[in-house]
């Protein structure tokens, strides 16, 4: 695209949710995972115990999570010019609970990306695709926060500095 040329209008993917409406261009952004980074999902972990993992119940209970205050505080101190992208492998079916949770804690965010209906890919693959989509939208991913070491490695491979938050969920 040449300087001064209008950017083609992009349709927002269905599994993306803007906080205050879509932006014309992405800009500098910081990416936060939710479960284990912003939300304390520890009381839901029992749904994932062997021999039977109940992902449906695990995600359905996400609206009751406590806030991880120390990480949430980062949202308040980051420069206002940075866009906050919440990138979670939660399925779209729990978007209502997720949005209510974000409202309850009055968290700063610009874009929420959740796993689309019928997407059963591994979290790492889903988030890798999201990184590509964000860049195509014009986002400059400056930093990420993640509790899954596989996703941390993916961000690093993609040239995005990523801070590992130990949630204990993957021990």
What do the predicted segments below correspond to?
Residues 24-25, 81, 134-141:
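Glycine-rich phosphate-binding loop signature in dinucleotide/nucleotide-binding domains
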Residues 76-84, 90-118, 133:
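Substrate-recognition/cap helix-loop segment adjacent to the acidic, metal-dependent catalytic center
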Residues 131, 139-171:
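Acidic, Mg2+-coordinating phosphoryl-transfer loop and its flanking beta/alpha structural elements
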Residues 122-134:
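Short loop-to-alpha-helix "cap/lid" segments that border enzyme active sites
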Residues 44-58, 107-114:
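Short, basic/glycine-rich phosphate-binding loops at helix/coil junctions
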